[in-house]
Amino acid sequence: MRRRSFLAATGAAFTALATSGAYARADTSFSRSIGYGTLVPDPKGVLDLPEGFTYRVISSLGDAMSDGATVPDKADGMGCFDLGDGRLALVRNHELVPRDSSGGAFELGFGAKDGVLVPGGTTHVVLDQKSLKVKDQFRSLGGTIRNCSGGITPWGSWLTCEESATGPGQKYGEGLDKNHGWVFEVPATATGLVDPKPLVAMGRFNHEAACVDPATGLVYLTEDRTDSVLYRFIPRVPGDLSQGGRLQAMKVEGIPDLRNWTGMSMAVGAAGKVTWVDLDSVEAPKDDLRYQAAAKGASLVARGEGIHMGEGEAFVCSTSGGARKLGQIFRIQFSPDGESDRVELFFESVSKHQFDYGDNVVVAPNGHLIVCEDQYTEVVDNHLRGIAPDGNAYPLARLRLQTELAGACFSPDGQTMFVNVYAPTKTLAVTGPWDSFNAKTITVS
């Protein structure tokens, strides 16, 4: 099954889910796909994978880059681009705060603290598409804070998101010279540091991720707060976000709170009618944009994080949503002009063995969702979790290190999955028999 097939497969799957309510049950038994099989312990102690899958480390913290700096830490969201001439570019976020090391001084950046450019931003990793050997590495954006996730655009750029709405006179803002909490755009074709221009019209908040509908040019944005909302940006000029536009928030008819924390406001397989409410004062100097949205009827989401675009739809991870607060995945279906969009609760975890605090999300070559876990416990056991179109979850990989996996993305040919080990930074390339999925399910208690 390929990515396009996910649409057809999910239609029948959602019907079955709505009938059975399989993932809305209060008990802890559930069905799980066998998937790619048992995870094989990694002798290097990094990443357990199913038999037949392998990984290689292509970039690590401290590696020398061509601009004289070294690879920074805290690698997070990431996108993969085809540069042509047999080259790929990975544009990689680094979720650095002012006290972190930048990997070396740089002269062009957005903001400073106490006169020194803050270390967050992006790096480029340019690869040979066949050998996956690194041809170049360099910093491509600087002077930002906590670049968490982002998203690719149809015109070949990476939207990198600051998960930090801080600035002068604000919490954590001592010594800063500018407000932060913006989205920045980095062309995949960049060859060095780009001029950092915040896309102010896309709002100031705890940005997490973004995705662009190629059919309309609309941008969908998540916010990592326990009382967040989902945003939509309508650009004045599709394909040119710098020209400004209109920011809106998602309102689900009759459901002001999608989190399912205090009751089942939306069952798995159920859907609601969506309207989009316009927002004002989107630069939000008091970091109150979500409050403005909620006051206008926008529906609350529990920590909106990963978002991935499909054909006419987007999948959104709510990290701590659900009755067990283990995570939800929503499916937003876009409708033609004059009709209302719809949002459907595709998945809600009832067990840590399904997934526990899903973060980044991507569609795999077989059409399944791949979710990166980011657990908030003293000892973590983070996995990559697959979710098949029938709603069954399975383990794809297990990280053996005490950190998270982030930024999962696939090469344009679908043969390689790239993923980051957050800290200490490692960027991995995973290959294997992506078409060998076993759809058989088992019941787990």
Task: List PLM regions with ranges.
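Blade-level signature of beta-propeller repeat domains, shared across WD40, Kelch, NHL, RCC1
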Residues: 409-445
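N-terminal secretory signal peptides and thylakoid transit peptides that target proteins
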Residues: 1-14
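Beta-propeller domains
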Residues: 46-75, 81-133, 175
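Beta-propeller blade signature
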Residues: 119-128, 178-189, 234, 329-333, ...
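Loop/turn-rich, solvent-exposed surfaces of beta-rich toroidal or solenoidal domains
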Residues: 319, 352-389
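Blade-edge beta-strand/turn elements of extracellular beta-propeller
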Residues: 43-61, 68-69, 128-141, 184-206, ...
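C-terminal segment of N-terminal export signals and the immediately downstream linker at the start
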Residues: 20-57
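Beta-rich, blade/repeat-based domains predominating
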Residues: 69-80, 144-155, 203-217, 296-311, ...
